[in-house]
Swiss-Prot record:
GO terms for cellular component: mitochondrion. This is Citrate synthase-lysine N-methyltransferase CSKMT, mitochondrial. It comes from the Eukaryota. The keyword DNA repair does not apply.
Length: 240
C-alpha cells in the first residue's frame, strides 16, 4: 500500500506509460472506482500498452510458472486475476507461458476492461496478442472482485492472482477486504493457490489472512527488491 501511495504522488507513471496525473489522486480512496476509471482513461504516452503497480509479469514469472507446471492439468489451467486493471500479469501469462492456461482478468473499472480487450483483439495500429501455447486463451470481464457470481462458479479456478487489490479494497475498510478474500476462496479450487502480491509487511498481513482463510495454508515469500522496494507474495493454498 505504501508503494501505491508513493506512485500516486509521482507526476508521471513509469515503465513506458508516463501518464501524468490530473489532480491530487493521492488523496483519494483507493477503493473508489471513479479514481481508477480516471487513471485508466488517461492518455498513454509511451510504447508499453500495459501499466503495473508494484511490478510486472517478468518479475514474478519465476514464481508463477512452476505452479503451472506442478498442476499438470489435463486441460488448460484456469487462472483468475482479480482487479487486473491494465496490468501485464494476464497478458504475460497468456503470451509467454509454455503451459496451456485459460486466463480471466476481472476489474470493476469498465475503462480498464475496455482497454485490455482492445489490446487483446488488436486495436488501431496494434497486433492482436498471440498465445504462448496454442491451447491458451485470455478474456477480460467487468466485475467486482467481491461478487464474482456472474463470472465464476465455486471451485472453478486453480490459480488466483491479487496484485494490490486487497490493499486498495482495504482502504474502504477491512470488512470489504475480508469479503474479497472470501469470494476469492469460494471460486478457488480446493487444491488451488491464491497469491496476494503486496508491499504490506507480513506482521500486518499474515494475521488478517490467517483469520480470513481458516482451513487453508498461508505462507509468504519475499520478492525483490524492485526499484528499491521489497514486496511479498502471500500464498493461500489448499491441500495438494
Amino acid at each position: 500500500m505504501a508503494a501505491l501511495r508513493r506512485m500516486l504522488h509521482l507526476p508521471r507513471l513509469t515503465m513506458g506509460t508516463c501518464r501524468p496525473f490530473a489532480g491530487s489522486l493521492a488523496d483519494s480512496c483507493l477503493a473508489d472506482r471513479c479514481l481508477w476509471d480516471r487513471l485508466h482513461a488517461q492518455p498513454r504516452l509511451g510504447t508499453v500498452p500495459t501499466f503495473d503497480w508494484f511490478f510486472g509479469y517478468e518479475e514474478v514469472q519465476g514464481l508463477l510458472l512452476p505452479l503451472l507446471q506442478e498442476a499438470q492439468a489435463a486441460s488448460p489451467l484456469r487462472v483468475l486475476d482479480v482487479g487486473c486493471g491494465t496490468s501485464s500479469l494476464c497478458t504475460g501469462l497468456y503470451t509467454k507461458s509454455p503451459h496451456p492456461v485459460d486466463v480471466l482478468g476481472v476489474d470493476f473499472s469498465p475503462v480498464a476492461v475496455a482497454h485490455m480487450n482492445s489490446l487483446l483483439e488488436g486495436g488501431p495500429g496494434q497486433t492482436p496478442l498471440c498465445p504462448g501455447h496454442p491451447a491458451s486463451s485470455l478474456h477480460f470481464m467487468h466485475a467486482d472482485a467481491r461478487n464474482l457470481g456472474a463470472v465464476a462458479s465455486s471451485g472453478s479456478f486453480q490459480l488466483l492472482l491479487d496484485k494490490g487489490t486487497w490493499d486498495a479494497v482495504a482502504q474502504g475498510g477491512l470488512p470489504r477486504a475480508y469479503q474479497l478474500l472470501s469470494e476469492c476462496l469460494r471460486v478457488l479450487n480446493p487444491q488451488g493457490t491464491l497469491i496476494q502480491f503486496s508491499d504490506e509487511d507480513p506482521d500486518v498481513r499474515l494475521p488478517c489472512l490467517e483469520q480470513g482463510s481458516r482451513g487453508w495454508t498461508v505462507t509468504v515469500q519475499e520478492l525483490g527488491p524492485f526499484r528499491g522496494i521489497t514486496y511479498f507474495a502471500y500464498l493461500i493454498q489448499g491441500s495438494h
